[in-house]
């Protein structure tokens, strides 16, 4: 800055972001394909989520679906959690704590999957219940559903999420 004392700096970040949002037909096709790969990954994840399976099996199936479809993986690849009372996301614990846990009836396993294609990323979030969901998961499901209902009633066309925060947070 000292070498350009008369320079004027102008914030163009909003205008630049607007330019980046415009996509060609080809770019939109790649974005749609990335999303389709992510959906295939979710199908593979759900198919491999069952009692007796290692929690790593659904993750492996999801990643295989992306790569075999011509996509690629970007960090963090996937964030995951499994168990009857585990509801936080993070890197899979078996990566630093040893053998993946064996899924049991009453568990749920959830993940956020990142599918890349043509330089574009899609993100899918999935949660699979192994057998009947336990009481805590059912209670959390009801809280989420009620929050959604309250927000949907208050949501005018063109609303911003910030306008929905109050009705949703009162659940």
Regions found by a protein language model. Name each.
Residues 1-171:
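Active-site neighborhoods and metal-handling regions in enzymes and metal-associated proteins
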């Amino acid at each position: 800055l000292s070498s350009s004392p008369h320079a004027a700096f102008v914030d163009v970040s909003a205008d630049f972001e607007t330019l980046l949002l415009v996509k060609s037909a080809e770019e939109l096709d790649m974005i749609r394909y990335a999303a389709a790969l992510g959906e295939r990954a979710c199908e593979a994840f759900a198919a491999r989520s069952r009692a007796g399976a290692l929690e790593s099996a659904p993750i492996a199936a999801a990643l295989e679906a992306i790569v075999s479809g011509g996509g690629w993986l970007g960090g963090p690849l996937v964030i995951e959690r499994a168990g009857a009372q585990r509801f936080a996301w993070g890197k899979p614990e078996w990566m630093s704590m040893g053998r993946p846990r064996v899924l049991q009836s009453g568990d749920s396993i959830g993940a956020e999957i990142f599918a890349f294609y043509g330089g574009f990323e899609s993100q899918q979030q999935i949660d699979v219940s192994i057998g009947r969901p336990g009481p805590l998961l059912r209670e959390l499901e009801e809280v989420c559903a009620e929050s959604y209902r309250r927000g949907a009633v208050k949501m005018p066309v063109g609303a911003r999420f910030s306008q929905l925060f109050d009705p949703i947070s009162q659940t």
